[in-house]
């Protein structure tokens, strides 16, 4: 594959423009540094060891990840300073966590209940170490996280246990990330994270600990949250490659570039209204937002649309006024990058549209 033009690749496939990727990573890092914030980017988006390493090389303080199986792959690849952002409860996941901590004992984990805290303290005792914990705060999603009413007492208990070490709090508002209007998004996120910051201050005063972490934020609120004094680090993920959902919201600073695109080929053109392509729901995660077609056969176009009418697992429908011929390659920005990436095995990395590397999506399918 190395040396081929991207239009020669078999489809459907994911292509990453390396220069745009690096630009996005460096842009985020410089922005955060100017605001005196750390970046602990979330690898749930790209699921790729090579991209993690680029982020660390650019100055990220560590890597955020959701599942123990994902974290274990990163630890084996010598990616350090991990934050696992979802509670680890089952015996199988706790066994995986034990393996992670043996490779990377500085790893941090979130906790949101007394019951889970007891499990983690017991694991720390068995491993003869103190496990680094952030108290996870429910940001209003109702998904994970302790309530603001219970988080203070939970933090004190973490601090009192012999085999756990309180490092701070996490408050991630995923439901704010795609609020279209910047002002509405800013108002919501600022109110929430200031409330979390007051909680952090109360915990510091009660425990005598200083400089506790306040982690959270995403691609939709990174610029807003970086102006909040109590926030110490941000966890954006999609900024690396971007997607249509994030291009649709209002930012007050410059946009990141569409570093990742999906290529699909026209396989049937027997109708005047549409053509059929080889990317269905097995290649492209279905959202209410449609993909944005940006080119056919390398030529810019704005008159084609990928429609979500039911064309099946293997096929997609492209309509428009200037329909492409059989064999044409369609390039598009995907609606939602995280789950789309999880459908693929590899990234084809290009410079000037020529493949220069093939990177495994090593965390793909690591759901446990």
Where is each model-derived feature located?
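Generic N-terminal amphipathic, Lys/Arg-enriched alpha-helix
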Residues: 1-16
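N-terminal glycine-rich anion-binding loops that anchor highly charged ligand groups
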Residues: 20-51, 66
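Conserved, mostly hydrophobic/aromatic
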Residues: 21, 44, 74, 135, ...
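Flexible, glycine/charged-enriched surface loops at secondary-structure junctions
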Residues: 37-38, 205-213, 326, 344
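Active-site-proximal beta-alpha core segment in soluble small-molecule metabolic enzymes
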Residues: 42-177
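Active-site loop/helix belt of alpha/beta enzymes
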Residues: 138-251
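Active-site loop ensemble at the mouth of alpha/beta enzyme cores that anchors a bound cofactor
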Residues: 187, 222-299
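C-terminal accessory subdomain/extension
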Residues: 270-368
